[in-house]
């Protein structure tokens, strides 16, 4: 299983955005839609070996964490169309209003899609119980020089704003920084690259 954890610094935590202007009204949920596309979709098939967590930290009710579970997801629900994915995120945020403030319980929204009030650190602590953690940063160890385990791997990365120094201090205490290159790449492109690289290594 491959896990991707995305910190979405400004992504809205309520279904209050316009589908006609996702970049301008949602805190860049459009970037999250593209990242999900890169995580799960192949040209003619769907990756069932991927799990994605997205922690949304924008207004009005942060944090909200979404979990997309590849083995349970149906391609017809999470399809490559950006607007339909944004609608699903909006639906999840609507359901998230039912969760008690300090609870970390997850609510199932659709097959393979869950919402919770977990913080970014909560998500990390859940993941590292079962997965070695790799932090995708430009100044990390070259990914081609890293010896990955043969089954479960987890990667954490930021959105267009990135990870803060406080985030990195915490993450480096529980994981290892790795890099796909010397420049800041789009979140969706980084996920696509990592998936392709793990495919080449034969890591499920």
Curated annotation (Swiss-Prot):
Enzyme class, broadest EC rank: transferase
Q: Where in the cell is it found?
A: Cytoplasm
Q: Which GO terms describe its molecular function?
A: S-adenosylmethionine-dependent methyltransferase activity; tRNA methyltransferase activity
Per UniProt, where does S-adenosyl-L-methionine bind? 136, 158
InterPro entries reported in the protein's UniProt record: Alpha/beta_knot_MTases, TrmY, tRNA_m1G_MTases_N
- Say which family it is in: Belongs to the methyltransferase superfamily. TrmY family.
The record's section on PANTHER family has: TRNA (PSEUDOURIDINE(54)-N(1))-METHYLTRANSFERASE
The name this protein goes by in its record: tRNA (pseudouridine(54)-N(1))-methyltransferase
Protein species of origin: Pyrococcus abyssi (strain GE5 / Orsay)
């Amino acid at each position: 299983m491959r896990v991707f954890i995305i910190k979405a610094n400004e992504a809205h935590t309520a279904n209050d955005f316009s589908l006609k202007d996702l970049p301008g009204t949602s805190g860049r949920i459009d970037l999250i839609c593209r990242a999900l596309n890169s995580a799960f979709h192949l040209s003619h098939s769907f990756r069932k070996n991927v799990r994605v967590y997205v922690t949304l930290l924008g207004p009005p009710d942060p944090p909200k964490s979404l979990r997309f579970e590849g083995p349970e997801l149906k391609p017809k629900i999470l399809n490559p169309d950006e607007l339909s994915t944004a609608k699903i995120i909006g639906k999840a945020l609507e359901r998230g209003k039912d969760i008690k403030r300090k609870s970390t319980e997850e609510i199932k929204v659709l097959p393979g899609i869950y919402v919770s009030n977990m913080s970014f650190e909560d998500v990390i602590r859940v993941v590292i119980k079962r997965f070695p953690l790799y932090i995708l940063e430009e100044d990390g160890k070259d990914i081609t020089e890293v010896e990955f385990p043969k089954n479960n791997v987890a990667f954490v990365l930021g959105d267009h704003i990135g990870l803060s120094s406080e985030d990195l201090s915490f993450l480096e205490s529980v994981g290892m920084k790795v890099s796909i290159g010397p420049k800041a790449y789009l979140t969706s492109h980084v996920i696509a690259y990592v998936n392709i690289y793990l495919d080449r290594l034969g890591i499920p």
